Regions:
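Interhelical loop and helix-boundary elements at the membrane-water interface
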Residues: 1-3, 30-48, 76-90, 122-143
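Nucleotide and nucleotide-moiety/phosphate-recognizing core
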Residues: 1-36, 56-60, 76
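Interfacial segments of multi-pass membrane proteins
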Residues: 8, 45-80, 91-102
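Hydrophobic, aromatic-rich alpha-helical transmembrane segments
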Residues: 15-16, 44, 57, 61, ...
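Hydrophobic alpha-helical transmembrane segments
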Residues: 19-24, 48, 61-66, 86, ...
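Alpha-helical transmembrane segments of multi-pass membrane proteins
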Residues: 25-30, 68-75, 116-123
């Protein structure tokens, strides 16, 4: 996800609405790979990190995403992983709304955030349906 977005920043302004497609393409490609007939997917979380790393020097979106992943993996541990991922991306999207209003001020980056987050959540929908209530655990780690 990093390389296409980083290269595209030399040709398309990240504040251009066309840039949304550039950012969404690697995530969709990893979620629904052509090679596997659009059925088996994976690594769209990694691709989403790469996509937002490609926005160098604007690293705030990927830093916020990394913060939420670390928070729900180390401080407030949520298991199973699919639930942790969904909660992480929801928190990331909400935080990015406020970051866009007060700091970033780029609607295309916000829309990319929401679309990428929705794609990741949608891909984890099946795993969420298979989770039984007794499997869900929230553990708060103290320093």
């Amino acid at each position: 996800g990093f390389l296409p977005v980083y290269i595209a920043t030399f040709f398309v302004n990240p504040d251009d609405y066309l840039f949304i497609l550039v950012m969404l393409a690697p995530v969709v490609g990893h979620a629904y790979p052509l090679y596997y007939g659009f059925k088996k997917g994976g690594k769209c979380i990694a691709a989403s990190f790469g996509v937002f790393l490609g926005l160098i020097p604007n690293l705030l979106p990927v830093l916020i995403l990394a913060f939420w992943f670390i928070f729900f993996s180390v401080v407030l541990i949520i298991n199973p992983h699919a639930l942790r991922t969904v909660v992480t991306y929801i928190c990331w999207m909400v935080t990015m709304i406020f970051a866009t209003i007060f700091i970033i001020k780029s609607i295309p980056i916000l829309l990319s955030t929401i679309l990428v987050g929705a794609m990741v959540i949608f891909r984890h929908n099946k795993a969420l349906k298979e989770i039984e209530e007794k499997e869900i655990k929230f553990v708060f780690k103290r320093g």
